[in-house]
Amino acid sequence: RRDSLNFSISLFAETASALIGLDLDVRGRENLWKQRPAIFMFNHQSNADMLIMASLIRRDIVGVGKRELKNLPVIGPLMGAAGVVFIDRSDRHAAIETMKPLVQAMQEEKKSLVIAPEGTRAPTRKLGAFKKGGFHVAIQSSVPIVPVVIHNSGDISPKGDKIFRSGTVHVDVLPAIETTDWSVANIDERVADVRNAFLRTLGQPELSVEETAMARRDTPDDLKPEVRGRRKKAGLKNSASDPSEQDSVPPKRRGKRGICLL
């Protein structure tokens, strides 16, 4: 079953990429294979990120996804078969409990975890605040973290758009970060270190440990998953509070043909 699943993941990645016309320009590809199992953390801009990560990791993976993805045609069942854990982002404590089987999968089955520490797609190219869930898993499993920095997947499928467009996405796979000496006591420092590695690679200003810890609290209310969920149920539009951030949203390429996979 495991070999069949690995084959299905690779086949899906290759077939979907060919249909879309998606090419990957990857620097540091060797870091994908130097240490397994690992926790592959990626910054989340687009629905295309799932396809990108499947194309890169290819085998023996488990993942975390928002509960809403479970009901998507094609992608939802495939993610479920691949062992993706679907979480309710509005219930923090339940989400933490749901992630516990991931540690067992990594330790006993030697599978790698694929996770977006931002917890949701960023509405702009600016890196969002990091949640601690993946870092707690790293502490419990003692497996290394491999940062996967995706630069422009929003060009392929901007947030809010179900159409995938052809193009080249640039990716940096950074060297593995060991976690064997990590503890809950220094988790804020570790989150800041990993997030700053992303910021450096993206060409964005780094933050101190204190600034990183404050970033989640300072996230505009209408960008927080739990608030977005309440607004959606009420029929209200979700948008960034700061209008200046809207200018950095990757533009939709009008008139270019695309394909809908969702």
Identify the role of each PLM range.
Residues 27, 64-66, 88-89, 117, ...:
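Thr-Gly-centered strand-to-loop micro-motif
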Residues 3-11, 17-21, 34-92:
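Catalytic core of membrane glycerolipid acyltransferases/transacylases, capturing the structured
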Residues 96-262:
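Non-catalytic C-terminal accessory region of glycerolipid acyltransferases
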Residues 24-28, 48-50, 99-101, 157-159:
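A generic local structural motif
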